[in-house]
From Swiss-Prot:
SUPFAM superfamilies: Nucleic acid-binding proteins, RuvA domain 2-like
Species for this entry: Desulfosudis oleivorans (strain DSM 6200 / JCM 39069 / Hxd3)
Subunit structure: Homotetramer. Forms an RuvA(8)-RuvB(12)-Holliday junction (HJ) complex. HJ DNA is sandwiched between 2 RuvA tetramers; dsDNA enters through RuvA and exits via RuvB. An RuvB hexamer assembles on each DNA strand where it exits the tetramer. Each RuvB hexamer is contacted by two RuvA subunits (via domain III) on 2 adjacent RuvB subunits; this complex drives branch migration. In the full resolvosome a probable DNA-RuvA(4)-RuvB(12)-RuvC(2) complex forms which resolves the HJ.
Domain notes: Has three domains with a flexible linker between the domains II and III and assumes an 'L' shape. Domain III is highly mobile and contacts RuvB.
Chief location of this protein within or outside the cell: cytoplasm
Protein family membership: Belongs to the RuvA family.
Protein name, UniProt field: Holliday junction branch migration complex subunit RuvA
Gene Ontology molecular function terms on file: ATP binding; four-way junction DNA binding; four-way junction helicase activity
Spans annotated as Domain III: 152-205
Task performed by this protein: The RuvA-RuvB-RuvC complex processes Holliday junction (HJ) DNA during genetic recombination and DNA repair, while the RuvA-RuvB complex plays an important role in the rescue of blocked DNA replication forks via replication fork reversal (RFR). RuvA specifically binds to HJ cruciform DNA, conferring on it an open structure. The RuvB hexamer acts as an ATP-dependent pump, pulling dsDNA into and through the RuvAB complex. HJ branch migration allows RuvC to scan DNA until it finds its consensus sequence, where it cleaves and resolves the cruciform DNA.
Organismal lineage: Bacteria, Pseudomonadati, Thermodesulfobacteriota, Desulfobacteria, Desulfobacterales
UniProt-listed InterPro entries: DNA_helicase_Holl-junc_RuvA_I (IPR013849), NA-bd_OB-fold (IPR012340), RuvA (IPR000085), RuvA_2-like (IPR010994), RuvA_C (IPR011114)
Any one of the GO CC terms: Holliday junction helicase complex
């Protein structure tokens, strides 16, 4: 069972990366919030991930899901205990930092949870019913970490790429979402802050 991988970036795709660890290349599936933290990373850059190894009789091909921190991985373990949220759906819905998702659960904010990809009103209520009282430590810890980077055209462009390629928005819609977020808050300095600005104003439906 693989629990941790360290190596260099070989290739970056829409929702996964190919990590070269020694002579072996591992395909690692990443939630959008983790992928956003890799903005600016290039081929050959060193990377490491805490890994959730997913394999069942119905899913015989191993799937490696990567996280930046043990905290993110621990939250993921709790998230998949919610009825109707399996590992692949959990990856899909983690479009906000875990601190914000946890806070929404603890405060019963079903409106924000319902904005996560693949999470409707019913699933949002299930998340609250199952996890409220269990994820406070993640909310207290705040947003998951990501490298501080200046807000540049590259940051905006790559955020658009994540919104389109991984979250399913149309290019024009994604560009408007990013532009609106940057107009409201021109001091955005991290990928999380940009996604936060987009989602907290209800633009991501």
């Amino acid at each position: 069972m693989i629990g941790y991988l360290e190596g260099t970036l070989l290739k970056k795709k829409e929702d996964r990366i190919l990590l070269l660890a020694g002579p072996v290349g591992y395909e690692v599936l990443l939630p959008a919030v983790v992928m956003a933290s890799l903005q600016g990373k290039r081929e050959g850059d060193p990377l490491f991930f805490h890994i959730y190894h997913y394999q069942t009789e119905r899913q015989p091909k191993p799937v490696l899901i990567g996280f930046n921190t043990e905290e993110e991985k621990d939250f993921f373990h709790l998230l998949i205990t919610v009825e109707a949220i399996g590992p692949l759906k959990a990856v899909q819905c983690l479009t906000l930092p875990i601190g914000e998702v946890a806070e929404a659960i603890e405060t019963g904010n079903s409106a924000l949870l319902g904005q996560l990809k693949g999470v409707g009103g019913r699933t949002a209520q299930k998340m609250i019913a199952t996890l409220k009282g269990k994820v406070g430590r993640f909310a207290d810890a705040g947003h998951s970490s990501a490298p501080d980077v200046p807000v540049t055209g590259s940051l905006a462009d790559q955020t658009v790429e994540v919104l389109v390629g991984q979250l399913g928005y149309k290019p024009n819609e994604a560009r408007l979402m990013v532009a609106g977020a940057l107009k409201r808050n021109p001091d955005v300095s991290t990928p999380e802050a940009l996604f936060d600005e987009i989602f907290k104003h209800g633009q991501a439906q």
